[in-house]
């Protein structure tokens, strides 16, 4: 296995691998030109190309607290070996940002605002903007949920997950429809067009392992391999959800997070309406339901049942989160 890494470093990047240490994120490599980390990214080739362009723009605009991605000898943002993609990046601090206090989330919200602001002017051929992606996704998930309900009712017998779906069907269908309407009222299509023109992106994994903290308190951001051409507000909505999940979330805490984020990316009244829609939509529950029924299962997995039950309870926060944001408009 070490021979493969030596080959990747030599033929892909022109570096001599002298020693490698495995970590939870990849292989930290000591080379003839210093330390770097070789990783197997999770994203597609398009998302990796976009991530490369995003990082370049962030650094150009002064946001340097990221893992710089190094191009291959052929100028590509990734190297392909035996069908597997690899990327080479700077080594990030090993300590993750503790997500157990309101103060940590305030720091995270401000860093998120700084990062989104630094993406202005981003232009990438790998960014594929879709003017109605989220509204269409919300409508699609509602349609899928209705089909599952009809199929279950026609069959006439219900397993544990069918019963769970039955319990949450009406309220979550109503919330998904309201969320779709809020995106329309908040001008989602216009916001996408504006972001595409001005430059921006959505990280899609701004949490946990992606947030590293140096001993001096600085926060570094990694895990860009899932970034996409989407409203940056989607990152903020996901981070607010996580704040409520990881702490005893309060309205005051959310207001403070919005204020910290807004120092760098001011939030308009229409932005707040879009946030309401994103927070109200039961994203995790509907995604897991779709995943489960698309597998054409023959038995009910206890693990999946637990995941769905936990997601259903977690999504109950959506109405409260929407009300908190509405109160700030």
What residue ranges belong to the model's regions?
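ATP-binding glycine-rich phosphate-binding loop
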Residues: 4-31
């Amino acid at each position: 296995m070490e021979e493969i890494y030596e080959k990747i470093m030599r033929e892909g990047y022109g570096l001599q691998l002298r020693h490698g240490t495995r970590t939870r994120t990849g292989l930290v490599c000591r080379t003839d030109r210093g330390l770097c980390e070789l990783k197997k990214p999770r994203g597609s080739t398009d998302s990796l190309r976009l991530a490369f362009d995003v990082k370049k723009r962030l650094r150009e605009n002064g946001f340097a607290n990221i893992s710089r991605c190094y191009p291959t000898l052929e100028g590509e943002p990734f190297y392909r070996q035996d069908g597997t993609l690899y990327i080479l990046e700077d080594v990030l601090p090993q300590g993750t940002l503790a997500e157990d206090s309101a103060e940590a989330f305030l720091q995270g919200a401000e860093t998120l605002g700084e990062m989104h602001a630094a993406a202005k002017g981003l232009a990438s051929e790998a960014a594929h903007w879709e003017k109605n992606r989220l509204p269409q996704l919300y409508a699609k998930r509602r349609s899928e949920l209705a089909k599952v309900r009809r199929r279950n009712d026609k069959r006439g017998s219900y397993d544990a997950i069918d019963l769970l779906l039955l319990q949450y069907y009406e309220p979550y269908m109503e919330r998904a429809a309201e969320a779709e309407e809020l995106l329309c009222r908040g001008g989602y299509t216009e916001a996408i067009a504006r972001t595409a023109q001005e430059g921006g992106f959505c990280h899609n994994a701004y949490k946990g392992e992606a947030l590293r903290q140096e001993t001096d308190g600085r926060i570094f951001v990694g895990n860009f391999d899932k970034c996409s051409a989407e409203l940056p507000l989607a990152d903020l909505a996901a981070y607010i959800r996580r704040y409520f999940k990881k702490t005893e979330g309060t309205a005051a805490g959310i207001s403070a997070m919005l204020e910290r984020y807004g120092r760098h990316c001011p939030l308009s009244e229409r932005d707040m309406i879009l946030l309401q829609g994103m927070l109200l939509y039961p994203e995790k529950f509907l995604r897991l339901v779709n995943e489960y029924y698309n597998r054409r299962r023959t038995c009910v997995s206890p693990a999946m049942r637990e995941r769905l039950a936990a997601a259903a309870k977690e999504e109950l926060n959506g109405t409260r989160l929407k009300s908190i944001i509405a109160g700030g408009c």
